[in-house]
């Protein structure tokens, strides 16, 4: 199975803790022995801090985007270092490079690509480009809700959801000040466009990430820590 994983910087690079990188690397190493695996690393708090500082000194938004991309690539380098010989030696900077980097048993690790796109969007486009079997969005949220659960205590979690419904929810959440959707709007559009099977899951525990991707990916069964996005409902 070819899996593209968007690994959120908020969980991978939290406090830039080396142990977290090593734990995720261990999980990815095991998964790569059974699946073809490409990982897009997010920027997390470090990216947000750099972008905030860039804005404060007068940088335009495109420059801020490029700074964020560089931070995601630094996180990708750290994860690749933690993987050691089990990672492809080069960090791809575009989709074609990523496709050419695929090797049996090796994990391809990359960061952002284009200004204006989150790493979730990059992962979705990469999954479409490679015709991946699964796009997994690993984050600190345990799935897709009817609204932002941090702002709305009555929000309902979905076990499965169609791409069309996902877009409606994401756009509604993004319109509300202070709310944050679990999937980037561009990523949601890509998922709809290519009819891609996707999973949004809580992966703060690296072991949980391994269990879900390894045991559940082929079954598309409901999981407690995530939401399936699929046309097969």
From Swiss-Prot:
Name under which the protein is recorded: Uridylate kinase
EC number: 2.7.4.22
Binding site for UMP: 43, 65, 113-119
Subunit comment: Homohexamer.
Protein's cellular compartments: Cytoplasm
UniProt similarity note: Belongs to the UMP kinase family.
Organism of derivation: Methanosarcina barkeri (strain Fusaro / DSM 804)
InterPro entries cross-referenced by the UniProt entry: AceGlu_kinase-like_sf (IPR036393), Asp/Glu/Uridylate_kinase (IPR001048), Uridylate_kinase (IPR011817), Uridylate_kinase_arch/spir (IPR011818)
Keyword Ubl conjugation: no
Keywords: ATP-binding, Cytoplasm, Kinase, Nucleotide-binding, Pyrimidine biosynthesis, Transferase
